[in-house]
């Protein structure tokens, strides 16, 4: 609703260049504060949804760092997992390490016969169990694999996310539109 009002109506839906009108509000503290309030409300909504559906309590003060897409080696969910393990090791080496709190959210489905993809899902779930139970990581690092990723879950997730990992191997992603959905939210 706010973007609709600031952009002057629905024109931006068919003509994205109409979003340039938003540049006029780049330093408008009232608009920026309102956008922050909307993002916060979306994060709280998503956190309530995850608690209800998966029993997981999210740190809504953390950055929501998201990678949701079909699981495949070229989409590099494993690379993202290795980055999380690096951060985890940094915290193990220095529990007082200052870092921006981050919740890593994964959502994916694997083809039935794709054994490597299924192992990556197991790895992410194992990492989540270890990291989320570690008191050193509390309020700093959290990992959640979103079960049964689908459109209704995406409707809660996309408006709440702050970072969308788009790290597929160059030239391999045919025509994904998930990045555009995240951008518009």
What do the PLM-derived regions correspond to, one by one?
Residues 1-185:
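Catalytic cores of carbohydrate-active enzymes across secretory and cytosolic contexts
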